[in-house]
């Protein structure tokens, strides 16, 4: 018997490059997946024909609180792979707080369902965002660049605020929500999972010396968080950084 059959996961941002890989990985592990997608054609037929995948055609912020609570119900975990598209409208248009607002509303949906056990919330974030729960060193030059990014690129602020919401408003002792915010470095595409390293904090500059992280490795780690309690217990309430193993100290 597949021990993952009882695991149901809600994925938002599943039409993105990493989100699709996560859905594929979860299905391969025998999990049941609900995926909120704006476009019904974002998944290949080989995936949509899977009886354990349920597609919800909607924009996540357009859902009512009641609908969001229904979609979140019976889910062991909720994963946000949301991001802003790399276009002028995606970067400077509305909603400028897509990731933050979706995280807040999804966590509120979890709380409203009053589950007897905490629900896992996994956020895909970025190494450009510091974990302010830790004393992560940052150079003056990088601090200046980050300051400019906050002024010029609204998505960077959105990523910061989403993680800050989990750190400060959900915190470490919430009875309903446990969380992990994953910080990949420069994302690349690869065909298969390779060895990767996980660190509590960045081991190289995200601005001046960024490492590489394959999307499929990020998806693999997120799936491990959901399906392996020993992995979850190690990283819950933290913001792990993920690098390709051969690139971590290159």
Across the structure, where does each feature detected by a protein language model lie?
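Short-chain dehydrogenase/reductase
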Residues: 92-100, 138-141, 148-161, 208-216
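Conserved Rossmann-fold NAD(P)-dependent oxidoreductase catalytic core, especially the SDR/UDP-sugar
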Residues: 34, 89, 104-153
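Conserved beta-loop-beta element that borders a ligand/cofactor-binding pocket
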Residues: 163-189
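SDR active-site strand-loop-helix element
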Residues: 12, 36, 78-82, 121-127, ...
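Glycine/proline-rich active-site loop of Rossmann-fold NAD(P)-dependent oxidoreductases
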Residues: 131-134, 191-196, 227-237
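N-terminal Rossmann NAD(P)H-binding glycine-rich loop of SDR-like oxidoreductase domains
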Residues: 2-31
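NAD(P)H-binding glycine-rich loop region in Rossmannoid oxidoreductase-like domains
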Residues: 9, 35, 41-42, 47-105, ...
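Mid/C-terminal beta-alpha module of Rossmann-like enzyme folds, strongest
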Residues: 2-3, 17, 205-250
